[in-house]
UniProtKB/Swiss-Prot annotation:
It is an enzyme of class 4 (lyase). Forms oxaloacetate, a four-carbon dicarboxylic acid source for the tricarboxylic acid cycle. This is Phosphoenolpyruvate carboxylase. The lineage of its organism: Bacteria, Pseudomonadati, Pseudomonadota, Gammaproteobacteria, Aeromonadales. Its cofactor is Mg(2+). The active site is at 137, 542. GO terms for cellular component: cytosol. InterPro entries: PEP_COase, PEP_COase_bac/pln-type, PEP_COase_Lys_AS, PEPCASE_His_AS, Pyrv/PenolPyrv_kinase-like_dom. It comes from Tolumonas auensis (strain DSM 9187 / NBRC 110442 / TA 4).
Amino acid sequence: MNDMYAALRGNVGMLGHLLGKTIKEHLGDEFLDKIENIRQLAKSSRQGNEEDRQKLITTLKNLSDDELLPVARAFSQFLNLANVAEQFHSMSRQGELHTTLDPLDSLFDKLKNANLSEQEIIDTVCELDIELVLTAHPTEVTRRTLIHKHVQLNECLEELELQDLTPRECKFIQHRIEQLVNQSWHTNEIREQRPTPVDEAKWGFAVIENNLWPAIPLFLRQLDDRLQENFGIRLPLRAHPVRIASWMGGDRDGNPFVTAKVTQEVLLLSRWVAINLFLTDIQELVSELSMTDCNEELRQRVGECSEPYRAILRVVRDSLRETQQAVTAKLQGQYTENRDLITRTEQLREPLELCYRSLQSCGMSIIADGMLLDVLRKLACFGVNLLKLDIRQDGERHGQVLSELTQYLELGDYAEWRETEKQEFLLKELASRRPLLPANWQPSAESQEVVDTCRVIAQTDPDAFGIYIISMARQPSDVLAVQLLLKEVGCKFHMPIAPLFETQNDLQNAAAVLNRLLSVEWYRNYIRGQQYVMIGYSDSAKDAGMMSAGWAQYRAMEDLVAIAEREDLKLTLFHGRGGTIGRGGGPAHQAILSQPPGSLKGGFRVTEQGEMIRFKFGLPEVAIHNFKLYTSAVLEANLLPPPKPEAAWYDVMDKLSEISCQHYRSIVRDEPDFVPYFRAATPEMELGKLPLGSRPSKRKPNGGVESLRAIPWIFAWTQNRLMLPSWLGAHVALQAVMDEGKEDLLKEMDQQWPFFHTRLEMLEMVFLKADLWLAEYYDLRLAPENLWPLGKRLRQELQDSINVVLQLLPKRGELLDDQPWIKESIKLRNPYTDPLNVLQVELLHRSRATPDEVNPQVDQALMVTIAGIAAGMRNTG
């Protein structure tokens, strides 16, 4: 055991002891002994003791119905507490953030040694535009009630780390920790009802209020300090290197519960939260800025008064209060007069910047650069709308509206027209001054919903929105259709529209679609030199396998960047990544640096999904660290871009992509036993019972694997520890290339090409979380005997995959030898995750044995094991 993790293990041990004490008080000594016996058997099993492994299986098989839920809860709660301890450790004085070089320091050291002009560095920093898009993907299984308790636990651990605590203070904090552990144990960890889209949006607002709101100014102070220390420059007052956007309340793709009314409510709530936060800050500034000296500009504004800063800020405060009252009234459905309200960010910025200039010119820079500067920076990042709301809709839905409309107007059926005919019609109507929508036209409910959403956009402040994303975009007409619908409802601003390319085929055609769009003069005038394109990671990986999808994404980005350079466009690529490797997840810093050269010049936009929001932004200190990782990676990619890959590397990747895709599809699509095996050997069918997000798990209720969303697809394979979507196909391709005598070339690619190196590193992480004996146990206990050969084949492929990757990676004795922190983290969890897996198998067996009977104890325990394994894996989908 590594001594550097002694503090982590100490906190895990303390929290585990307190949980044990709580369980003992609630359920008695005998039950606690049973839990401890299961834990010891799991630990011994993990060390290879076959006899104890069988004892573990037998013990969990023999649990009575009454014991199922408390056993599941004990191990699930322990894993949640381990996550709390780990998140605290990562930012504690003994943790990773304090014992490794700060990402910004590391970057600036590199920049100072590079052959770059100071102006080049200044310009790149000032143009930095990173947009983190919070999404409501249903992968956060931990209840928000418990998340709040976990945050309080973290605060207690932080206090305990202080060196000068008195024994009384120490005892008080430890007592509070014990209270919180007790509260967690006596709280149901599974929410009883699915959250509504508005609930999801409110959770997003809470993340901003509690974590990102305090983190942004602290992060920008640190960035500003580094710039001054290294280059003698200041961050501009209006700079916003990091901004926040959201899909919560705007993403209606496959979610019938996100309606135009919901979007309107979320927009108002977002504004209310922003106004409330700024109101608190302005009130504090009124208290702070009691100075009497001011410049002539401010004096002319406020007249002869002894406290000019307070005078102007009180006016701002009163306007904010009035605005908040008006927004509250709107939310309650009441009519409000158009009073002098704060509706634009500039209305708030102008008086604050006036105060800032005055303080600076009167020799009070130290005061100007205090809280006032922090508020100005929050304003640059969040604005008076708090965040930018994206709208996402399936491309077919826009076509459906136009199809109904053209039939009503007796022009034919838009859906049956050729692409050229669609474009001709759309461009003609876009250029026309007369309205297309008849006043008395009554479309279907689905089409009316699309039109109503466009009306909400048209009637709202443009700054409240991010971009409009079209899922499954395949033709220029998909984009032009949205532009026409927005025009027809009176939208006066140019809403940025991004086609989303999701499948492997769509990614391969992305450049052709963009080329065709740019050949349309009307479209070029509309976009005004700025093009957004979204790259889908989840569905492309589900469609073609991780390795092939990764290469399709890379080539698509390269082609799109080449078009942008040729056409002199600012191209912003929007990355739809998930939390897991199989959905494009993985360490952010490496992922950014592995993108094609030039792909970050137009900014960086990425989704932050589900439980990853909590892991990356769940505490202000952790959020600051992740802001630094993103910032340093994007700056490095733009200022020190990786070299263009060698021609030989392209050839190898083309081959790897082709072989891995063929193999992946030969199993997932063509193997007749695959779907029955998937349904039997994973809890996929049972996942629908878990009230995670507001969105249904399938696009089409009666569809098979192809209609399953990427999240439950990944979630199911993560639960049974086979982790199949993240590796299937890769090893066959790698082995084929090695058999051609190109092993040294693969090793060269690993050492010199960030894209390929990141692929192998992500595979390593997946392999360490996968588990062959547990995957086998799911098969033998749950799948019919005729499906066992397929399971055996897949497990052998997993083992072959591990062997191939270890052969390619230099000087590796074991997986992740060069990343001890991740390795220790996974090792710490296994003795608690393994019993949940074994218990889950037993619960699935009991549930499926009597499908017509409802057993609340079994169902509830099953839900807890699903949540617990997700906590143990530290990701779901």
